[in-house]
Amino acid sequence: MNPTENGKPPTMTPLNRPIRPGLLSAALLTVALLASACGQETPEQGASAAVIDNDRCMDNQRAGTITFVTGYHYQASVSQLEVIAAEAMGLFETLCLDVEIQPGSGDVMGNAQLVSAGTAHFTPAGNEAEIVQANERDHEVVGIATYGHVPISTLLTQQNVEHLTDLEGQTLGHQSMLPAPVEAMLVEAGVDVDTIEQVEAGYDPSVLPRDQIQALTGFRSNEPHQLDAMDEKYTEWLPEDFGVVGSFGVMATNPEWAEEHPTVVEDFLRAVARAFDHCSENGEECVGYAAELDEAGYDTEHNLKVWDTERELVGGSTPDDQVNGYIDLTMTAEEAETLKDSGELDSVPDLEPLFDPRFLEAVHVATEVVWPGDE
């Protein structure tokens, strides 16, 4: 297995996966619900009046303020930047959704706990394995969209590491927990993970070239770009090069709350899908929306690289006949097996209650998001 040098991921190609039949009847029902929408200009042009019928609007308003907690501050990651852009563009408002965005600290399980408790309503998880792990910790969350179908977690080492087994007896830094795809990669490579000292290393990747640690987990859209900007040398190890499956950019919500407010969940995902399409063509504009929220200063150039890297990975791992965010439980099961293989799980739980594609499928016809007023 050859590692990737200096953060340049291989070209992604669409995965040859079985087609999940879309819920066309649900999508047609959505069209019917929106049939009375007014024929105004698109929300990107600044319209604020509701574009859905009164009954649906009232249903959405009854949910009150909807809190979205970001994964990590206002970073331009998939499943995060689109929400920021949807709010800035007025897309939520046109669907009668009152969305409040709160910055997260990078504590995935902490965010899951907030959603499970009903303190927050939506949050991104790093991958589908984290949805499983959260529920194993009694944080009741459900994955409603998975945007990336390749591991985004990566392992960076100093260049003198020729084999992953060289890390035995060394120190590995992570942000809050060892990502499941990275742990699975280490196990697949024959590493005795128990011999590696694991520490929380924070979010400054310069600890790696300063030799404070010998390996660092991260996101291929983030830390490699940061180290490249510092002109530092490193070796990047990608889980898929070791046969490890994975995902990223998973939108999560509270399952009980979602059943109480199905139109809210549908229209939240509708606005996010609309924003993704817009931001794919207008990355600088959308990153600018995130910059406006960050009072501590914002590296616009770096965050544009984060967004471009992740949206390309989404496109490369989504088959042409699937919607962005599709859920394939066969792939989910393969990812969950990595948790079992690494000892994180004794057995793989029933995954169907943990992932629900109905809300995403209800707002799409074929691969296109249904938006009121569009021809």
PLM regions with names:
Residues 39-41:
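Bacterial signal peptide processing site
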Residues 4-26:
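Bacterial N-terminal signal peptides that target proteins for export
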Residues 203-299:
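Pocket-lining segment of extracytoplasmic ligand-binding domains
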Residues 261-344:
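Secondary-structure end/capping motifs
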Residues 32-37:
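C-terminal motif of bacterial Sec signal peptides marking the signal peptidase cleavage site
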Residues 44-201, 206-210, 214-218, 237, ...:
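Short, glycine-/small- and polar/acidic-enriched structural segments
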Residues 87-91, 95-96, 119, 124-127, ...:
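Sec/Tat-exported extracytoplasmic proteins
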Residues 333-375:
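Conserved C-terminal helix/tail region of periplasmic/extracytoplasmic solute-binding proteins
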